[in-house]
Amino acid sequence: MFSQRLLTQTSLFSLASLAASQSAIQFDGRVPAGTQLSAFDSENGLFNPSNVFGKNLTFSQLLQLPDVPPSLFDAGTVPLEVTISDQSIFAPSATNVQLGFRRAELLPASNNGTDPSTSGVKSLHFSLMKDTARPLNLSHEYQLAFVESNDFSTNQFVLKTGTLLDTATQGGVDPDSLILFGNVKQSQILFNTAFTEGVFHNFGLTLDFNANTTQVFYSTGNDPLAQVTEPLTNDISGQGQYHFGVLKKGVNGGADITKDAFQPSGINEGIIFGGIFQEDSSASTITLSPQAGANATAAASNGTAAGCTKKRSVGSIAGRLQYVRED
C-alpha cells in the first residue's frame, strides 16, 4: 500500500533549497480581490471570455462574487460563482443548439486543448460550495468539473452531482453527493462524498498522463487535503480542456440528450468555486495546504492502485516531502 513518512529535518535545508523546491504553476484561475465581473467579458488571463455560456449572454451576466469566506487555497483571492438560468442554452454552431442542456463553465485561459496542462504529471486543484439561495434541482444530473478531450469524444474525468442518468451507476448513490468519475467511456466511480452545504469541498487530482492514472486528494473547509485513493488506472489520454461550472442535463432525453431532453422553466441555480489552479507534479508532489511559513506537500505516488510503486519520505524541505523508490 501507498505509504509516506515525514522526517522533521527542515532545519537542515536552506531557504535557497526551499525556493528551488516550489512546484511550477501550469495555470491559475484564482480571482484577485477587487476584480470586477466585467473583466471576465474580455481577455483577463484567468478564464476564456468566449466559452462556455448561453447564446447572447456574457460572463458578467452569469458570474457572481459571493459573500463567502475564502476557500482553502484563496489568499488575497476570492471565490467566484457560476450560475445558470433559462437562457443558459449553449449553441456551438447554428446547427448545434443544446436545448437539452443548461450550462455555463469556466475554461482556463491558457488551456487550448493541446497545451501542457494535459501532459506529463499535473495536479489540479479546485474547491466548490453550494449556494443555498440558488439550489440545484437534484432530480437532474449535473457536471461541475471535467476535462473534455481535444476531439470532444469523451470526458477523461468528471465530477457529478444529482440523479445520475446512467442506470448502471445510479443505484445506491445519493443524489446529494459529489461523485467523481473516471473516463466516461468506462463509467468508473473514483470517489464520492456527501455534498454538505455551508462548507467548501476541496479536491486535488494528480493526473499522470504518462501512466494514465488519477489519484484523488480531498478535504472540507480549511483542512489540508488528504489522500483518499491510490493512483487509479484511468484513461486520461487525448488532451483537452478543463471545465468548471454548471452543466445541467435534461431528463427524458431520447436519442440526443443535448437537444431533446426536457428542462423546466424558472431556473436560477449556481455553484461557488474557489482555489482553481494546476501545478506541475513531475517531482511526485502535490500541495496539500496553502503556504504558511512552509509549503506543505505530500507525495503523489506513481503506478496504479494494484501494484503501484511505493515511495517513502527520505527528507523534507520546510514540509515538502522528497521521495525515492521503495520497490
Each model region followed by its residue ranges:
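Low-complexity, Ser/Thr/Pro/Gly-rich disordered linker/stalk regions
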Residues: 2, 20-172, 182-184, 235-312, ...
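Beta-strand cores of modular interaction/reader domains in eukaryotic scaffold and signaling proteins
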Residues: 127, 179, 204-206, 215-217, ...
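Short, aromatic/His-centered strand-loop micro-motif at the edge of beta-sheets
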Residues: 180-202
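Localized edge beta-strand/strand-to-loop motifs within extracellular or lumenal beta-rich domains
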Residues: 196-214, 221-222
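Hydrophobic residues embedded in beta-strands of well-ordered beta-sheets
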Residues: 78-80, 176-178, 212-214
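Juxtamembrane loop segments immediately following a transmembrane helix
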Residues: 207, 217-243, 249
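Cleavable N-terminal signal peptides of Sec/SRP-targeted secreted and luminal proteins
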Residues: 3-21
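Surface-exposed loop/edge segments in extracytoplasmic proteins
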Residues: 153-155, 187-191, 223-230
